Amino acid sequence: MQQFEWIHAAWLAIAIVLEIIANVFLKFSDGFRRKIYGILSLAAVLGAFSALSQAVKGIDLSVAYALWGGFGIAATIAAGWVLFGQRLNNKGWAGVILLVAGMVLIKLA
């Protein structure tokens, strides 16, 4: 395991935020019918992967990718709830709990 440095965690946080932004823009694009949002979504994804590439210089790939994906999913669920009124059923909440547990286990491994 590599030695932790805050700059890599900052890059990971930027990657997570950009992934969430990309997902929200993708929803706003309405299947790319609203092209500006589709283009903004693609730009945010490019930025997210660029930031993730910087994060993995100091964070193990398995940990960085799991945290990026996990936090991205959890925050996108929250954004869907707040912005679009989307709600999870009980199975969805069970999935979120398993997701968070998996992220914790990967970080502790």
From Swiss-Prot:
It is found in: Cell inner membrane. It comes from the Bacteria. GO terms for cellular component: plasma membrane. It is a multi-pass membrane protein. Its main location: membrane. One of its GO terms (molecular function) is spermidine transmembrane transporter activity. Pfam families: Multi_Drug_Res. One of its GO terms (biological process) is glycine betaine transport. Belongs to the drug/metabolite transporter (DMT) superfamily. Small multidrug resistance (SMR) (TC 2.A.7.1) family. MdtI subfamily. Catalyzes the excretion of spermidine. This is Spermidine export protein MdtI. It comes from Klebsiella pneumoniae subsp. pneumoniae (strain ATCC 700721 / MGH 78578). The gene is mdtI.
